[in-house]
């Protein structure tokens, strides 16, 4: 079974590109990473930084998560990310996403030993 840490990597890590220059990036990646199976995941963020840099966020600024838990961490610096948002008229199985390239701080929930990201909470 896929661990929470592995799921985070599948859903949120794309270290192979510095940015998502293509407007079809989200449509391709959401499908490739199995987030359009059975339904269209409405919102997802990909991080274009090294896995080591994203793991390091777990030792940066401790902040509250959206759900009230206290195991979220905010990156010190802005990271290259891509926001994928399902377009209003898109219906499964034709998941059609808006691709937005951003540089923002990220907030992730971390747990385990090693202490690694298991949930993408927000970008700010």
Curated annotation (Swiss-Prot):
<feature type="disulfide bond">
    <location>
        <begin position="40"/>
        <end position="95"/>
    </location>
</feature>
<keyword id="KW-0378">Hydrolase</keyword>
<dbReference type="GO" id="GO:0016829">
    <property type="term" value="F:lyase activity"/>
</dbReference>
<feature type="disulfide bond">
    <location>
        <begin position="26"/>
        <end position="84"/>
    </location>
</feature>
<dbReference type="GO" id="GO:0003676">
    <property type="term" value="F:nucleic acid binding"/>
</dbReference>
<feature type="binding site">
    <location>
        <position position="85"/>
    </location>
    <ligand>
        <name>substrate</name>
    </ligand>
</feature>
<keyword id="KW-1015">Disulfide bond</keyword>
<comment type="similarity">
    <text>Belongs to the pancreatic ribonuclease family.</text>
</comment>
<comment type="subunit">
    <text>Monomer. Interacts with and forms tight 1:1 complexes with RNH1. Dimerization of two such complexes may occur. Interaction with RNH1 inhibits this protein.</text>
</comment>
<dbReference type="InterPro" id="IPR023411">
    <property type="entry name" value="RNaseA_AS"/>
</dbReference>
<feature type="disulfide bond">
    <location>
        <begin position="58"/>
        <end position="110"/>
    </location>
</feature>
<feature type="disulfide bond">
    <location>
        <begin position="65"/>
        <end position="72"/>
    </location>
</feature>
<feature type="binding site">
    <location>
        <position position="10"/>
    </location>
    <ligand>
        <name>substrate</name>
    </ligand>
</feature>
<feature type="binding site">
    <location>
        <begin position="41"/>
        <end position="45"/>
    </location>
    <ligand>
        <name>substrate</name>
    </ligand>
</feature>
<feature type="glycosylation site" description="N-linked (GlcNAc...) asparagine">
    <location>
        <position position="34"/>
    </location>
</feature>
<dbReference type="InterPro" id="IPR001427">
    <property type="entry name" value="RNaseA"/>
</dbReference>
<feature type="binding site">
    <location>
        <position position="66"/>
    </location>
    <ligand>
        <name>substrate</name>
    </ligand>
</feature>
<feature type="active site" description="Proton acceptor">
    <location>
        <position position="12"/>
    </location>
</feature>
<protein>
    <recommendedName>
        <fullName>Ribonuclease pancreatic</fullName>
        <ecNumber>4.6.1.18</ecNumber>
    </recommendedName>
</protein>
<dbReference type="InterPro" id="IPR023412">
    <property type="entry name" value="RNaseA_domain"/>
</dbReference>
<dbReference type="GO" id="GO:0005576">
    <property type="term" value="C:extracellular region"/>
</dbReference>
<dbReference type="GO" id="GO:0050830">
    <property type="term" value="P:defense response to Gram-positive bacterium"/>
</dbReference>
<dbReference type="InterPro" id="IPR036816">
    <property type="entry name" value="RNaseA-like_dom_sf"/>
</dbReference>
<dbReference type="Pfam" id="PF00074">
    <property type="entry name" value="RnaseA"/>
</dbReference>
<keyword id="KW-0540">Nuclease</keyword>
<keyword id="KW-0255">Endonuclease</keyword>
<keyword id="KW-0325">Glycoprotein</keyword>
<comment type="function">
    <text>Endonuclease that catalyzes the cleavage of RNA on the 3' side of pyrimidine nucleotides. Acts on single-stranded and double-stranded RNA.</text>
</comment>
<feature type="binding site">
    <location>
        <position position="7"/>
    </location>
    <ligand>
        <name>substrate</name>
    </ligand>
</feature>
<keyword id="KW-0964">Secreted</keyword>
<dbReference type="GO" id="GO:0004522">
    <property type="term" value="F:ribonuclease A activity"/>
</dbReference>
<keyword id="KW-0456">Lyase</keyword>
<feature type="active site" description="Proton donor">
    <location>
        <position position="119"/>
    </location>
</feature>
């Amino acid at each position: 079974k896929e661990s929470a840490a592995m799921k985070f990597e599948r859903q949120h890590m794309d270290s192979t590109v510095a940015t998502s220059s293509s407007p079809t990036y989200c449509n391709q990646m959401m499908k490739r990473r199995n987030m359009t199976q059975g339904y269209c995941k409405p919102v997802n963020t990909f991080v274009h930084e090294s896995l080591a840099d994203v793991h390091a966020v777990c030792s940066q600024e401790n902040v509250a998560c959206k759900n009230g838990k206290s195991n979220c961490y905010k990156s010190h610096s802005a990271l290259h990310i891509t926001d994928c948002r399902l377009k209003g008229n898109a219906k499964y199985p034709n998941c059609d996403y808006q691709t937005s390239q951003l540089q923002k701080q990220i907030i992730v929930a971390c747990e385990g030993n090693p202490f690694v990201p298991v949930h993408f909470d927000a970008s700010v």
